[in-house]
């Protein structure tokens, strides 16, 4: 397996661009201006990188450089989860990107808490079939999984850094949320093995990664979701006891008795936004989808004011696609936030990320895990249960951290890993608590503990 991995990497390296062609490719990918965009002082690039020639799989990226010292600031790759959901629709447009989309999808306005003040941000739509990323082999949409996604994300990075050689050897970090709790550590492991295979200074200079409200271990994620729903008075004592009695948190398929327990839990939830239980739901959405999501039956509501629909209007505009060098064939299809064909046909999903965490903490990478504390879908309870099984020695005991003269959350520092909660944030931490999320990022990039006082 390792030999096959090395052969693939060598083939990728042999196909990388020369310096003259990389400059030309950068010029072709440069975004002059997005429709409705305010004036900005930073450069943007977007386009495609082919990751599988035979199947015609190409991944779409959007790079937003920092407005100051972009030539020295680190590169940060942002990944959203799903699996099958767009990092451009969520991460770039709702969370950490420089722009927000207005309600009519006609204009953009600035996000004053954008993360590109601290790093050059690279958004990647992965795997093929998500967002603008595509495959010429339709069966690929029903054959995606963890392993292929991690491998092709690595191939993307190697080829992308050939196109943008100024980012080779630059400090590099990976950050993601939700099912990117798989993508991020799996890609970090691929990069770590890739760097070990070449005994020289790595062009992908991975320094660390950070995962927010991420899938970590199916057993503890599921158990934690039940505990969270009960402890936050969302389900009854009777239903909670029934879930604990009839649901196996290690099985992929649920029993009939477990399904009944989950059915009653769903009824007791009501129409609550499971991703942010104290936030209003988007009352204008008519196509809300119900997901079991491997934990509890919850209804997928996104944070008001219905930013999902704004993104779908904007990124389906032909002039936006032309400006972003997306959908170059102009084949009519609808850009969506999540590809449910990919989601519903996911082939391989590792049961636990804990073995990878053990391996990469030992490798000396900077690893942070954070949780918005109002998320009932991938809640803080499950994450804490999973982290406790790593049995890492405590360096700095639990304490409150501060942001803008308020408690931003709580944190504990272990040997090789930092855990932090973000008070008042949901599944998408930067949506509800953008300033606290930015404080978190600054501390992470600086390699410093979160502020103890204001």
Curated annotation (Swiss-Prot):
Active site positions: 178, 375, 427
Signal peptide: 1-22
Domain of life: Eukaryota
UniProt-listed Enzyme Commission number(s): 3.4.16.-
GO cellular component, one term: extracellular region
Pfam families xrefs: Peptidase_S10 (PF00450)
BP-aspect Gene Ontology terms: proteolysis
Keywords on record: Carboxypeptidase, Disulfide bond, Glycoprotein, Hydrolase, Protease, Secreted, Signal
InterPro entries membership: AB_hydrolase_fold, Peptidase_S10, Ser_caboxypep_his_AS, Ser_caboxypep_ser_AS
Residues linked to a glycan: 52, 102, 136, 287, 327
Disulfide bonds, paired cysteine numbers: 85-338, 247-258, 282-306
Annotated localization: Secreted
Tissue localization of expression: Expression not detected.
Primary location: secreted
Family: Belongs to the peptidase S10 family.
Job description of the protein: Probable carboxypeptidase.
Protein known as: Putative serine carboxypeptidase-like 23
Species of provenance: Arabidopsis thaliana
Gene: SCPL23
């Amino acid at each position: 397996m390792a030999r096959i991995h090395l052969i693939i990497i060598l083939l990728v390296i042999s196909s990388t661009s020369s310096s003259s062609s990389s400059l030309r490719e950068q010029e072709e990918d440069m975004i002059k201006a997005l429709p409705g965009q305010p004036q900005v002082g930073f450069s943007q690039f977007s386009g495609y990188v082919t990751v599988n020639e035979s199947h015609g799989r190409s991944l779409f990226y959007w790079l937003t450089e920092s407005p100051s010292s972009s030539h020295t600031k680190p590169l940060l790759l942002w990944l959203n989860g799903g699996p099958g959901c767009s990092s451009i629709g969520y991460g770039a447009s709702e969370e950490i990107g420089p722009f927000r989309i207005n309600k009519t999808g006609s204009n953009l306005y600035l996000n004053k808490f954008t993360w590109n003040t601290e790093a050059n941000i690279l958004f990647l739509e992965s795997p093929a079939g998500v967002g603008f990323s595509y495959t010429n082999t339709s069966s690929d949409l029903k054959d995606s999984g963890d392993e292929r996604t991690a491998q092709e994300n690595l191939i993307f990075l190697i080829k992308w850094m050939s196109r943008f050689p100024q980012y080779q050897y630059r400090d590099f970090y990976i950050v993601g949320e939700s099912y990117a709790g798989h993508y991020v550590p799996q890609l970090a492991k691929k990069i770590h093995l890739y760097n070990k295979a070449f005994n020289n200074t790595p062009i992908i200079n991975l320094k660390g990664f950070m995962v927010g409200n991420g899938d970590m271990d199916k057993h503890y994620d599921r158990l934690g979701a039940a505990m969270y729903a009960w402890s936050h008075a969302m389900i009854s004592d009777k239903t909670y006891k029934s879930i604990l009695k009839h649901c196996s948190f290690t099985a992929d398929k649920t029993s009939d008795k477990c399904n009944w327990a989950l059915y009653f839990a769903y009824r007791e939830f009501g129409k609550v936004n499971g991703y942010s239980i104290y936030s209003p739901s988007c009352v204008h959405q008519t196509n809300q989808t119900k997901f079991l999501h491997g934990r509890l039956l919850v209804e997928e509501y996104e944070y008001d004011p219905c930013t999902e629909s704004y993104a779908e209007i904007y990124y389906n505009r032909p002039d936006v696609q032309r400006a972003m060098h997306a959908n170059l064939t102009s084949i009519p299809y609808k850009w969506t936030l999540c590809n449910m064909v990919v989601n519903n046909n996911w082939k391989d999903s590792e049961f636990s990320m804990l073995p990878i965490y053990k391996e990469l903490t030992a490798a000396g990478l900077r690893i942070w895990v954070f949780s918005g504390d109002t998320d009932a879908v991938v809640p803080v309870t499950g994450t804490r249960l999973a982290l406790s099984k790593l049995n890492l020695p405590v360096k700095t005991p639990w304490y409150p951290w501060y942001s803008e003269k308020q408690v931003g959350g709580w944190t504990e520092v272990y040997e090789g890993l930092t855990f932090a909660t973000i008070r008042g944030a949901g599944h998408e931490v930067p949506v509800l608590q953008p300033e606290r999320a930015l404080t978190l990022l600054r501390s992470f990039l600086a390699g410093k503990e979160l502020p103890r006082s204001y």
